[in-house]
Amino acid sequence: MAASGRIAFLEGTYPSANMALVRGERPVLVDTGYGSDLPRTERLLRENGTPPERLALIVNTHYHCDHVGGNSGLQNRYGLPVAAHRWEAAMVNHRDREACSAEWLDQPVEAYAVDRPLSEGDELDTGGVTLRVLHTPGHTLGHISLWAPEEGVLILGDAVHGDDVAWINPFREGAGAMVRALETLERLSRLPARRALSGHGPPIEDPRAAFDAARRRYERWLREPEKACWHACKRIFAYALMIYGGLGRDEVRPYLLRCPWFHDFAKNGLGLRPEEFVGPLLDEMLRSGAAGWREGRLVALAPHNPPPEGWLTGPARPRDWPEPGRRGA
């Protein structure tokens, strides 16, 4: 699906996020999906006239596994450089255990390096489209979006979704994450965008209306922060069910009780002992339709492509990654 003649929207299916292909003499791929979906990513690129070996640069909107999971394979197979906000670049390249929130979220990410740290106001020229880097914190501190003024297109990442809002993580992204998300929305709403591409959901045909809806929801969460906690927990747990192919009845409780995100939201977000939160979260997953029991397993009900067993080929936690080799910028 095209966003404009020079920016192609590559729709992702969970566990992958959407991607964008920005065409030109030096084509750019924005985000790379989940690691197990790399063959599909390569196929989408070829179908859109840009085989992966022709890419000049990968740009990550932020470092969660559904947006950076294909980095490792694309770097190893094609030697492609990666660009990301300088704060997240430093964490990735230093193999910081907090990088990608991989351990906190229990989400695997294979090793990659960031070759080009980005800052607010940087410009990327594909030879056909100029992309302006916007620092858009909220979902993560180092989140960026890309503005193509000549196209009137915003590439949002998870700053705003086509059919939802991004979950907020005050425990790893700071107590002011919600306020930063609101400031990001205010800033984005001032741009004359005619179309916006988000990390999840369909293209946004009325960006201003989407920003207004997201702002109202975040403002409500500021007044009722427990709603933000429930939203985040359902999103994170549903994603875990997707990437692990569901959980058996006797696996749900032990799994949740070993997850750092579950402990933080239970104790610090909702004032509950983690053991007290297992039942209510499971009940809400079932009530809301986020998950259901199928043949004795709790599975996510949103459309998704379960990763095949054995797809990981290397360490899946940044602290275990090998040191990055030298790469050209």
Model-predicted segments: where are they?
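Short Pro/Gly-enriched beta-strand edge/turn motifs at strand-loop
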Residues: 1-7, 102-106, 127-129
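Conserved beta-strand hairpin/beta-sheet module of binuclear metal-dependent hydrolase folds
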Residues: 1-48, 52, 145-157, 162
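A structural signal for the main folded, soluble domain(s) of proteins
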Residues: 5, 55-56, 69, 74, ...
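Divalent metal-coordination and catalytic microenvironments
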Residues: 22, 31, 41, 62, ...
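Active-site HxH/HxHxD metal-binding segment of metal-dependent hydrolases
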Residues: 34-39, 46-126
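Metallo-beta-lactamase
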Residues: 34-36, 123, 130-137, 141-226
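Soluble or luminal CAZymes and related metallo-dependent hydrolases
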Residues: 37, 116, 176-180, 273, ...
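C-terminal regulatory/interaction regions
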Residues: 229-329
